[in-house]
From Swiss-Prot:
It comes from the Eukaryota. Disulfide bonds: none annotated. One of its GO terms (cellular component) is plasma membrane. Pfam families: DUF5355 (PF17306). GO terms for biological process: negative regulation of transcription by RNA polymerase II; nuclear-transcribed mRNA catabolic process, non-stop decay. This is Uncharacterized protein YGR122W.
């Protein structure tokens, strides 16, 4: 395979123009192969990724036809098929992430983009399953075979993680529509109570996602910022539940830990409003909170970014997926400001609870994580074409997901 092939970080694979396989396949396949090579020279926008899927599927179908008609299961052919299928799965992953980002940016929790994103992820996972079930992955040596199997395993975990992340981000979108609708300067008791009913469930999703993400480190999805993001949300959601249980000291402790995780992601200046909340000027506090919730991330801010483009939040070594950064800027940070104000006001005037700062004690209150398995779309190869269940075309007919 390729250097560092055991990780998904370098995906999609690039084909060599001087590969030995060009002497083993007919001219029409060489043309399709060159099209694949050229496709990776373009950007990774949604339209380009769809083009890549079409281009690489045609090459894969040609390879599969050649394999079966010529009864050619040579290691080079098998390895090329594996590379092509893995790349198509990666393109589906890219489109799934981008569509998820667009769904969140649309500010409508009920739009079809959530469903479309899940469909793309299912198709990508389905190709990984198709490759694992239908091929012995005969490669030049056992080491290369293990590399392919390890990549398939890591990609499967990443697809599962992205499905879980989709549910978490959808939850944030729903919460955003409830809280920021009137740009309130404070949450009414019934609003916090309503949030508390689902906050533990959302925390369980974050904990489950964190567990899955721990198995995906070093790949193309998970990094330290991703892990801090999930931890921050976990503490944030659990703080709401503790507040509703009249455990204001624990709620503040949970929120403080959430803020610590945020400070590993965003610059201190982005959270400077938290310091202003210590002011005794009530009017200033309320104006600040209103301003936080009225801020909007304009669609053009991240619109033209590539899915894995390195966007620097605050240092040359720190990068973050646009989807995660958008949810932080647009909702999580303003919500944190709002909750801290509410928790502190309640504790200083009514509860008088000692703030819990022992992280080990806070973690003892964590519920068991919740994970949801994603089933990949069933693919098959018939009459020279790769198709999935209930479809005659590999780029249309989106199904249900969230």
């Amino acid at each position: 395979m390729r250097e560092n092939a055991m990780s998904t970080k370098k995906l999609p694979y690039k084909l060599s123009g001087s590969s030995k396989i060009t002497t083993s396949i007919p001219n029409d396949l060489i043309i399709l192969r060159n099209n694949c090579i050229n496709s990776l020279n373009s950007s990774s926008s949604k339209a380009d990724s769809i083009t890549c899927i079409d281009t690489w599927l045609k090459y894969t179908e040609g390879l599969l036809t050649h394999r079966y008609e010529a009864n050619n299961d040579a290691a080079l052919i098998e390895e090329e098929i594996a590379i092509a299928l893995i790349n198509v799965a990666v393109f589906y992953q890219d489109i799934g992430i981008e569509t998820l980002y667009r769904a969140y940016e649309s500010s409508q929790a009920s739009n079809n983009l959530w469903t479309t994103s899940g469909t793309y992820l299912k198709r990508g996972l389905g190709l990984i399953c198709f490759l694992g079930k239908n091929f012995q992955i005969n490669t030049a040596n056992d080491c290369q075979k293990m590399q392919v199997l390890n990549v398939l395993n890591q990609l499967s975990l990443e697809f599962q993680l992205l499905q879980q992340l989709g549910i978490v981000v959808l939850a944030l979108s729903k919460l955003r529509s409830k809280i920021s609708k009137d740009a309130v300067a404070d949450l009414e008791p019934q609003e916090l109570e309503e949030l508390g009913k689902s906050s533990v469930f959302y925390a369980k999703l974050c904990i489950g996602s964190y567990s899955t993400a721990s198995q995906c480190q070093g790949g193309r999805i998970v990094d330290a910022l991703f892990m801090n993001y999930l931890q921050s949300l976990t503490y944030l959601f659990l703080s709401i539940n503790q507040y509703n249980n009249d455990e204001c000291g624990i709620a503040i402790g949970m929120l403080q830990e959430s803020i610590k995780k945020l400070l590993n992601i965003v610059p201190n200046s982005q959270l400077k409003e938290l310091d202003i909340l210590s002011s005794t000027d009530i009017t200033k506090k309320r104006d600040l909170i209103k301003m936080s919730f009225k801020r909007k991330i304009h669609g053009s801010t991240l619109k033209n970014q590539r899915i894995f483009e390195k966007k620097v939040p605050f240092s040359s070594k720190a990068y973050m997926m646009p989807l995660l950064k958008s949810s932080l800027d647009d909702f999580v940070i303003p919500l944190t400001i709002l909750l801290r104000y509410r928790y502190q006001t309640t504790n200083e005037n009514y509860s008088f609870k000692t703030v819990e700062t022992d992280v080990s004690k806070l973690k003892e209150l964590f519920p068991r994580g919740k994970s949801s398995d994603i089933e990949g779309t069933v693919w098959s190869f018939q009459d020279g074409h790769l198709t999935f269940a209930d479809s005659n075309n590999a780029t249309h007919n989106c199904g249900n997901y969230f």
